[in-house]
Amino acid sequence: EVRPLYAKDTVTIRFFGDIMMHTKQIETASDGNDSYDFSTYYKLMKGYLEDSDLNVGNMEFTLGGKPYTGYPSFSAPDNFADYIAGCGFNLFLCANNHIFDKGASGVKRTLDKYRQLAENFGIYFTGAATDKAEHDANNPLIINLKGIRIAFINATYGTNSFRGEGWPKTNMISDRKTLADALATAESKAELSIVLVHWGTEYSLQHSASQEQDAKWLAAN
């Protein structure tokens, strides 16, 4: 008897690192007439994306509108997000240091597009919100996969651009109360909690003392 490799209730989740849009990528995709073709970008990843129940990606760019720009202040063409969703990415992480690259209006425009993708492709997004109601609905984000309720919490160490005091907001590691509330909700409503933190020291393979402290706090809570 040949037995299946995985039980029927096995959930496969794949996590992908920073999805970005640098200037050279924008130029390469452009046809010179305000149209952009990204169809070759993730073709070699197709097999990995197709056999997962959930594909999680850190969306480290904004959809802030024109002019489209790469590093250090990212704004990608809108159809890049369509392409990503069409490839099979279905959980977009928004809490990272580039989410406010185009200011509050850039965040709002980005999340407006993600809401459209949620309707058209069934994607999820978390880590940033335009108002309290959206924040409360997606923090934690609880997804039912094959009958297993999994909570996702996304936060960042900081942002490169000034955030302001009001909405929109992104989840910060330093905001312990917001994280504690999300963790408590996850504990009561989900069977498994996954915290996705945008942190680390660039070009270093060693974590810092503060990152270790934050990790211990998250594990304890």
Language-model regions, residue ranges each:
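Acidic, metal/ion-coordinating pockets
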Residues: E1-N221
